[in-house]
């Protein structure tokens, strides 16, 4: 058949590129793992992983670094998806941080994120002896991610040096590393937030319902709407929890993640909203505003 008779949408091309990258990782690395944070990008990655190796089960496990402060609904969704898909899931909690009672309320966003997420991830990768960790970061999210390679090399201490990365020519990736080094791989690098939602709509991928607008109890704090997800969130003097129509564009630890006021309760509504919004999804991440806690500095220390 004449190749000119084929028509590929931009989503088809993005899907093909991501599946190629996933297969390349499995072929080139000794012990890869997929970082599953339970968000929309992770949900797309899991769907692509299942597609890439169907009808066989995925040949690599999923890894979730649990800070113990994720939204309750995220954990319930994670467990349901693992049961539905049959994938192997590893859950890691930084027990040293637990022993120190590290939390975002008492210790703040920067300390909590560093100990429970960054150090927790480094522990999990070392314990599992993983040489490649697949993540869902995209270049449109934030300026430091915009300059990161698809194959992002980390030294033996998991540190990222943005000035010491390898060139990537077309779809040719260099997977050679020295003992102790590792690579973070980002198959969704060339996707946008809108692409992710269009693909979720086309493929009917399940996502956490927190992405859809609904009346939820929130307090306004530091210019953000914080969901009162459980009794661990203390109200400040004068604060009152109110039901407001909100949804989340990004998900993380609930005291550090701001909701946005919205009536987008369906995938079609979310896509329509994405077409007109002028703001980045990371406007709702409190950690990005912490002094000395820029995304680049966190990534240099080993962050996702």
From Swiss-Prot:
Alphabetized GO MF terms: ATP binding; sulfate adenylyltransferase (ATP) activity
Superkingdom per UniProt: Bacteria
EC assignment: 2.7.7.4
Pathway(s) where this gene product acts: Sulfur metabolism; hydrogen sulfide biosynthesis; sulfite from sulfate: step 1/3
Sorted UniProt keywords: ATP-binding, Nucleotide-binding, Nucleotidyltransferase, Transferase
Catalyzed reaction equations: sulfate + ATP + H(+) = adenosine 5'-phosphosulfate + diphosphate
GO process annotations (BP): hydrogen sulfide biosynthetic process; sulfate assimilation
Gene3D superfamilies the UniProt entry points to: HUPs
UniProt feature coiled coil, ranges: none
One Pfam family of this chain: PAPS_reduct
NCBIfam families in the cross-refs: CysD (TIGR02039), PRK05253.1 (NF003587), PRK12563.1 (NF009214)
Assembly and binders: Heterodimer composed of CysD, the smaller subunit, and CysNC.
Function: With CysN forms the ATP sulfurylase (ATPS) that catalyzes the adenylation of sulfate producing adenosine 5'-phosphosulfate (APS) and diphosphate, the first enzymatic step in sulfur assimilation pathway. APS synthesis involves the formation of a high-energy phosphoric-sulfuric acid anhydride bond driven by GTP hydrolysis by CysN coupled to ATP hydrolysis by CysD.
PANTHER family per UniProt: SULFATE ADENYLYLTRANSFERASE SUBUNIT 2 (PTHR43196:SF1)
Family: Belongs to the PAPS reductase family. CysD subfamily.
HAMAP family referenced in this protein's UniProt entry, alphabetically: Sulf_adenylyltr_sub2
Protein name stated in the entry: Sulfate adenylyltransferase subunit 2
């Amino acid at each position: 058949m004449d190749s000119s008779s084929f028509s590929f949408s931009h989503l088809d091309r993005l899907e093909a590129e991501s599946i190629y990258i996933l297969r390349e990782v499995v072929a080139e690395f000794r012990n890869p793992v997929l970082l599953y944070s339970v968000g929309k990008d992770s949900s797309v990655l899991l769907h692509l992983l299942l597609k890439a190796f169907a009808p066989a089960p995925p040949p690599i496990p999923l890894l979730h670094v649990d800070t113990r402060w994720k939204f309750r609904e995220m954990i319930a969704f994670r467990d349901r998806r693992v049961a539905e898909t049959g994938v192997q899931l590893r859950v890691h909690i930084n027990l040293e941080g637990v022993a120190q009672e590290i939390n975002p309320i008492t210790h703040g966003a920067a300390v909590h994120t560093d100990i429970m997420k960054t150090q927790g991830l480094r522990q999990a990768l070392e314990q599992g002896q993983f040489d490649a960790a697949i993540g869902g970061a995209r270049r449109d999210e934030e300026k430091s991610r915009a300059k990161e390679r698809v194959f992002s090399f980390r030294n033996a201490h998991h540190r990222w040096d943005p000035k010491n990365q390898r060139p990537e020519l077309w779809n040719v990736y260099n997977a050679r590393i020295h003992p102790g080094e590792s690579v973070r791989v980002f198959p969704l690098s060339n996707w946008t937030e809108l692409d992710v939602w269009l693909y979720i709509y086309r493929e009917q991928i399940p996502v956490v319902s927190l992405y859809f607008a609904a009346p939820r109890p929130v307090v306004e704090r530091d210019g953000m709407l914080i969901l009162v997800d459980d009794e661990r969130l203390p109200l400040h003097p004068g604060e009152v929890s109110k039901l407001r129509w909100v949804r989340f564009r990004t998900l993380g630890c609930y005291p550090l993640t701001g909701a946005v006021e919205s009536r987008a309760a369906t995938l079609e509504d979310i896509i329509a909203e994405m077409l007109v919004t002028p703001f980045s999804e990371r406007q709702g991440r409190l950690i990005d505003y912490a002094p000395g806690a820029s995304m680049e500095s966190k990534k240099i220390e080993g962050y996702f």
